């Protein structure tokens, strides 16, 4: 899938002949685990910590050079085997072929005309690599004893993948041998390529991903060397950082949530064939059919014979695409930049603001987003900023006034300002905040554009610079939009324009990932998807936010690492037909502690 660079392709489990003392590596792994388990560094110290962790990782990689499992041939040499295997096991293989596209790498190309909403691809459960198949594999005994594997399905999948890759007779070998040998996720970035991301909003997630992956490797290296249930694993004599990085990258770029066989819970899966599809803007058109027990995908649009077949991965930002999928998507209509805001506890009105926010279902401190499209802020961020800028009298009105409930409902509705003065304040604040963020970058927009145009850069360096450029463009648009809104409301205030009446209002939608948690039906009418954003009122949003704990998470606000504890259940309605979010963005960045 996507544009994934490939140094050498893997085909059969052949270990290298190099030799290194397990005890020597174990000592380095212990040092790495200790370093990665230390408290988070203070402001401005993250880069220093990253370099230190990277240095330890490179020492381990150097010791392990030549020990990784390798495969012969090129990735594409084994596409025919994959198609044959898929066909023999009930998957659809007609109407498309796997080819290399100049810009996006390998993908699916239509060999016949395919109509929009036509079911063209299905993959039965038996072909999927899942947490359940991992528990029933050679990994099962260790899984039953290790709390990290039990709690984090993505790590379980990564080890499942490694164990099956090391077995030449694995059922999934036709699939595994077609996976890329390396990826363009930041785990593969050189230090100079990561340096291009310094001062960006995304860099913190890059650091976190690298640190947590290193911590996981160090933890599991010790487990594999010392745990009695790890003795029979094919990784016992060769579990390298290189292998683990490959496995977690394979999983983070491909994992998806599907229902378990009885439909009672969700689990993680790798889906052969389907994961070859590249991304474009659109709607999610993939779901899981419990009746036929298979993953199904309908066409996003009409595809003519010879055209590439695209799917929509979800409403991801480019930071999420780069960090979790290893590519940058130009003209991403869902791109956004994180912005962390909170009400200071030293604010004399903190208690009142906290109460109003609580009634609206908004935390006093949270990470919001500035969007590429207009308006640049979500209903939730608008509501937060309104409360943040309220006077004492305005807060009292929202807590004790005659229309207090209506006022809470309309906090996220742009048509019903709290007051003209409040609107001027919030847009002024947003303009100032976005302007300050712009000043933290070491280069400006024009310099980045010039650098991209005039330098011969690696794929990863290009992605990094495009990502920081995209952040600046979003922030600059936010500054301009905020300034325009500020002046508009200032004019309304100066002219003494009347405020809209609350009794004429409809509840405003407060976003917070709740919309994405609605479960569309497989093969649903795609036109209905456009109305989802309007379907939830604030009241529904708050109540559904609590219900999300028992449901399937779609979209960008998924559970960390795309997994949940095995005991969690789907409700009865969700069990009938569950749709997973295309290309879960989750990665293996959850903390692992010894």
Swiss-Prot record:
Calcium among keywords: no
Compositionally biased residues, Polar residues: 10-23
One GO BP annotation of this record: regulation of uterine smooth muscle contraction
UniProt-listed Enzyme Commission number(s): 2.1.1.85
GO molecular function: actin binding; histone H3K36 methyltransferase activity; protein-L-histidine N-tele-methyltransferase activity; transcription coactivator activity
Physiological role: Protein-histidine N-methyltransferase that specifically mediates 3-methylhistidine (tele-methylhistidine) methylation of actin at 'His-73'. Histidine methylation of actin is required for smooth muscle contraction of the laboring uterus during delivery. Does not have protein-lysine N-methyltransferase activity and probably only catalyzes histidine methylation of actin.
Keyword S-adenosyl-L-methionine in annotation: yes
GO CC terms in record: cytoplasm; nucleus
PANTHER family documented for this protein: ACTIN-HISTIDINE N-METHYLTRANSFERASE, UNCHARACTERIZED PUTATIVE METHYLTRANSFERASE
Domain notes for this protein: The SET domain specifically recognizes and binds actin, suggesting that it does not accommodate substrates diverging from actin.
Organism (species): Rhinolophus ferrumequinum (Greater horseshoe bat)
Gene: SETD3
Family the entry assigns: Belongs to the class V-like SAM-binding methyltransferase superfamily. SETD3 actin-histidine methyltransferase family.
Record-given protein name: Actin-histidine N-methyltransferase
């Amino acid at each position: 899938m996507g544009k994934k660079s490939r140094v050498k392709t893997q085909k059969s489990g052949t270990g290298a002949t190099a030799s290194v003392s397990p005890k020597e590596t174990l000592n380095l792994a212990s040092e790495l685990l200790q370093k990665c388990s230390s408290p988070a560094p203070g402001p401005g110290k993250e880069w220093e910590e990253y370099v230190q962790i990277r240095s330890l990782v490179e020492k381990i990689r150097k010791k392990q050079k030549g020990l990784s499992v390798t495969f012969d041939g090129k990735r594409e040499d084994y596409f025919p085997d994959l198609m044959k295997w898929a066909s023999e096991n009930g998957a659809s293989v007609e109407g498309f072929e796997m080819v290399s596209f100049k810009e996006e790498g390998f993908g699916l190309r239509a060999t016949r005309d395919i109509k929009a909403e036509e079911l063209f691809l299905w993959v039965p459960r038996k072909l999927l690599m899942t947490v359940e198949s991992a528990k029933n594999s050679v990994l099962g005994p260790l899984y039953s004893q290790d709390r990290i594997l039990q709690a984090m399905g993505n790590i379980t999948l990564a080890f499942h993948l490694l164990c099956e890759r090391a077995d030449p007779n694995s059922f999934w070998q036709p699939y595994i041998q077609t996976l890329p040998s390396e990826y363009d996720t930041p785990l593969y970035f050189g230090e100079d390529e990561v340096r291009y991301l310094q001062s960006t909003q995304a860099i913190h997630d890059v650091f976190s991903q690298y640190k947590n992956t290193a911590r996981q490797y160090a933890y599991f290296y010790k487990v594999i060397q010392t745990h009695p249930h790890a003795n029979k694993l094919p990784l016992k004599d060769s579990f390298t950082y290189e292998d683990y990085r490959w496995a977690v990258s394979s999983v983070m770029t491909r994992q998806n949530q599907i229902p378990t066989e009885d439909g009672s819970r969700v689990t993680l899966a790798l889906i052969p064939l389907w994961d070859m599809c590249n991304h474009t803007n659109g709607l999610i058109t993939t779901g899981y059919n419990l009746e036929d027990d298979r993953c199904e995908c309908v066409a996003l649009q009409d595809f003519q014979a010879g055209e590439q077949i695209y799917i929509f991965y979800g409403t991801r930002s480019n930071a999420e695409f780069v960090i979790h999928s290893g590519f940058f998507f130009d003209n991403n209509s869902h791109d956004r930049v994180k912005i962390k805001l909170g009400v200071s506890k030293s604010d004399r009105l903190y208690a009142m603001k906290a109460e109003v926010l609580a009634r609206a279902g908004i935390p006093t401190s949270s990470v919001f987003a500035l969007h590429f499209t207009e308006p640049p802020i979500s209903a939730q961020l608008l509501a937060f900023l309104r409360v943040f800028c309220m006077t004492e009298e305005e807060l009292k009105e929202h807590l004790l006034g005659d229309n207090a409930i209506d006022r809470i409902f309309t906090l996220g509705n742009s048509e019903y300002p709290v007051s003209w003065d409040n609107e001027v304040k919030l847009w002024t604040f947003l303009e100032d905040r976005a302007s300050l963020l712009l000043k933290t970058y070491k280069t400006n927009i024009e310099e980045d554009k010039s650098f991209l145009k005039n330098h011969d850069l690696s794929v990863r360096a290009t992605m990094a610079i495009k990502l920081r450029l995209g952040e600046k463009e979003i922030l600059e648009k936010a500054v301009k939009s905020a300034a325009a809104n500020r002046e508009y409301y200032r004019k309304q205030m100066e002219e003494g324009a009347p405020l809209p009446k609350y009794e004429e209002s409809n509840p405003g939608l407060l976003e917070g990932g709740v919309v994405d948690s609605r479960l569309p039906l497989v093969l649903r009418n795609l036109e209905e998807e456009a109305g989802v954003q309007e379907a939830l009122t604030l009241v529904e949003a708050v109540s559904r936010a609590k219900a999300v704990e028992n449901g399937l998470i779609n979209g960008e606000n998924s559970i960390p690492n795309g997994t949940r504890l095995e005991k969690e259940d789907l409700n009865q309605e969700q069990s009938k037909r569950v749709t997973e979010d295309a290309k879960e963005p989750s990665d293996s960045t959850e903390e692992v502690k010894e």
